[in-house]
Amino acid sequence: MESQRNILLIGLLFVSFLLWQQWQADKAPQPVAQTQSSVAPSTVADAHSSDVPDADSALPETVTASKELITVTTDQFVLKIDPVGGDIVHSALLSHKLEQDGDDPFVLLEQTNDIYYIAQSGLIGRDGIDSSTTGRAHFDSASREYDLAGQDTLEVPLTYLAANGVTYTKLFTFYRGKHNVDVDYQINNTSDAQLQVQMYGQIKHSIKKSESSMMMPTYRGAAFSTADTRYEKYSFDDMADKNLNKSTLGGWVAMLQHYFVSAWVPPENDKNIIFSSVSAGGLANIGFRGALYDIAPGTEQSIKAQFYVGPKDQEALSALSESLNLVVDYGFLWWLAIPIHWLLMFYQSFVGNWGVAIILITLTVRGMLYPLTKAQYTSMAKMRNLQPKLADMKERFGDDRQKMGQAMMELYKKEKVNPMGGCLPILLQMPIFIALYWVLLESYELRHAPFMLWITDLSVQDPYYVMPILMGVSMFIMQKMQPMAPTMDPMQVKMMQWMPVIFTVFFLWFPAGLVLYWLVGNLVAITQQKIIYAGLEKKGLK
């Protein structure tokens, strides 16, 4: 098959991928929420009888005054905790800047008049201290400012003395180098009656339109995991259509925002209910409810969960739950994207530059495919040499396609030519290209990652469109280097001539890292073509 047709095949596959991707985002079937039977109903409070505070009906007209909040500073973030309920209402990620050259940290959780994104946890049940009807507990704290400083761990205890004389302590534990927080309710039942409580954790997020595009789609919404479903996205539209109500052992819930995630992870051996809701005011809510605990008089009980707020760091997420790293969603080619990501990290650890690491991946891929590439050009050269015989067959058999096809197969067999031999390298390159596309799109490590000169962020488009234009020029050179069959259809010739322009336009808005991969791949292909064609000419093949 002619190389020109291969390039057309690339274009069709590429455009089909983009269209399929957009269709998935807009038209994919909504998942059906079904209650799982892995947990006996008696072990977990009924979803409809729970007293979890609902998502607020609207954004608050005013937010809690900053002087009332408890500020916790570690080496990774600055968190603010509201003493009313002990909710985490603000998180500034110190290692991740809002703007590449700016000083302001990236803020994930925040409670403002425009954006409402908080992590809430509490105790419900007969003796719970948080309720949608009676309100939240007002905790006391020894200080309004806590700093990890030179410590490896930092504990922030909040205390609440209930009317029955029972002391509830909500203990936050922070760790150096980590984005996760332990939230531990310690209940000392000094009363004469048995207590019954249940922990919940939920994430509330105001629904706003995603800023992604067809070329760089990003997901903003919820996700969850159960014993039967390791990972499932649950978009805001899904949440509006139907509330979740799933019983499971362990599990987790999360809110995703491109490179960042917030997640509640209850103990893996606990029996929980995963739930969701959307308020009339536009607040999406996803959370978990744990098992009911009976606390006898004179005893103490600890009920805990972990909360993560930070980048989609696969290693850190896996440490919390073996499936939480799946929030780094590489799509249907995840099995190929994972080794590509590992190789990218490996190269970067040596060279210290993500752009150079992408170049090394390109050289690795092209090197691995070189035997197939050589076979491709050899097959195409043989096919070109067969064109006169194929033209003669067309004249002899006319419109008799059956005889024509049979004669062609006999000719291919006699000349030892595989008419599909030129397609294999193309078909192998496309999955690699798509997998790398998702790696560059999903990997937080490439956010604000510079290359050289004007390319200061490989995760966004080239600001001056230099690389996409160079890529188009390289495609044009490749096209000119490849002999064009005289029998080629005129319409196909026209399409071929426009293909570099079409690709250039497509790549104008692609991440610079992906354009770099394709550009370097083209330059390597041009070099390989010259070497292969020189060898073919010595064998009398042109």
From Swiss-Prot:
Tell me the superkingdom of the source. Answer: Bacteria
The main place the protein resides is membrane
Biased composition regions of type Polar residues, renumbered to the chain: 32-41
Listed under GO cellular component are: plasma membrane
Using the UniProt annotation, give all residue ranges assigned to the region (Disordered): 32-57
Q: Name one GO molecular function term.
A: membrane insertase activity
Transmembrane parts of this sequence: 6-26, 326-346, 350-370, 421-441, 458-478, 501-521
* Membrane-protein topology: Multi-pass membrane protein
For the keyword Cell inner membrane, the answer is yes
Question: What UniProt keywords are attached to this protein's entry?
Answer: Cell inner membrane, Cell membrane, Chaperone, Membrane, Protein transport, Transmembrane, Transmembrane helix, Transport
Q: Biological process (GO) annotations?
A: protein insertion into membrane; protein transport
Q: Where in the cell is it found?
A: Cell inner membrane
Q: What does this protein do?
A: Required for the insertion and/or proper folding and/or complex formation of integral membrane proteins into the membrane. Involved in integration of membrane proteins that insert both dependently and independently of the Sec translocase complex, as well as at least some lipoproteins. Aids folding of multispanning membrane proteins.
Subunit architecture: Interacts with the Sec translocase complex via SecD. Specifically interacts with transmembrane segments of nascent integral membrane proteins during membrane integration.
Similarity-based family: Belongs to the OXA1/ALB3/YidC family. Type 1 subfamily.
What NCBIfam families does the entry give?
Answer: PRK01318.1-1, PRK01318.1-3, yidC_nterm, yidC_oxa1_cterm
User: What is the protein's given name?
Assistant: Membrane protein insertase YidC
To which species is this protein native? Shewanella piezotolerans (strain WP3 / JCM 13877)
Encoding gene, per UniProt annotation = yidC
